[in-house]
């Protein structure tokens, strides 16, 4: 039986979050064993924040949750791709549909930002 290898990166694995219809990569985050299990059991994406050192469910503040459609692992079983239905307009905390809106062009990184919501309004603390 295949077991996910959480040891290579100190207990974490990269999780690539992809739109289940378009294939667009929405975000990349990290999971530990607990958050992967929470994701598999709840059908919503859960992650471990390295910055805040805590567990979080995608959309817990913004309402932009992700419904799990399919989960795959790679040949080394040390990362996962999670295909989701994005509930709400955006996956990125910046208000963009995807976290990948900065493109290498002409020798520099160029931002192609098109926020679908105002983060200052959504993340009031």
From Swiss-Prot:
Compartment(s): Cytoplasm
Cofactor(s) required for function per UniProt: Mg(2+); Zn(2+)
Pathway involvement of the protein, from the record: Amino-acid biosynthesis; L-histidine biosynthesis; L-histidine from 5-phospho-alpha-D-ribose 1-diphosphate: step 3/9
Family matches, as InterPro entries: PRA-CH (IPR026660), PRib_AMP_CycHydrolase_dom (IPR002496), PRib_AMP_CycHydrolase_sf (IPR038019)
Record-listed Mg(2+) binding positions: 74, 76, 78
SUPFAM superfamilies: HisI-like (SSF141734)
Residues at which Zn(2+) binds: 75, 92, 99
Catalyzed reactions per annotation: 1-(5-phospho-beta-D-ribosyl)-5'-AMP + H2O = 1-(5-phospho-beta-D-ribosyl)-5-[(5-phospho-beta-D-ribosylamino)methylideneamino]imidazole-4-carboxamide
Any one GO molecular function term: magnesium ion binding
Cofactor binding: number and manner: Binds 1 Mg(2+) ion per subunit. Binds 1 zinc ion per subunit.
Keyword set, alphabetical order: Amino-acid biosynthesis, Cytoplasm, Histidine biosynthesis, Hydrolase, Magnesium, Metal-binding, Zinc
EC number(s) per entry: 3.5.4.19
Function: Catalyzes the hydrolysis of the adenine ring of phosphoribosyl-AMP.
Recorded family membership: Belongs to the PRA-CH family.
Assembly with partners or alone: Homodimer.
Protein name: Phosphoribosyl-AMP cyclohydrolase
Organism annotation: Geobacter metallireducens (strain ATCC 53774 / DSM 7210 / GS-15)
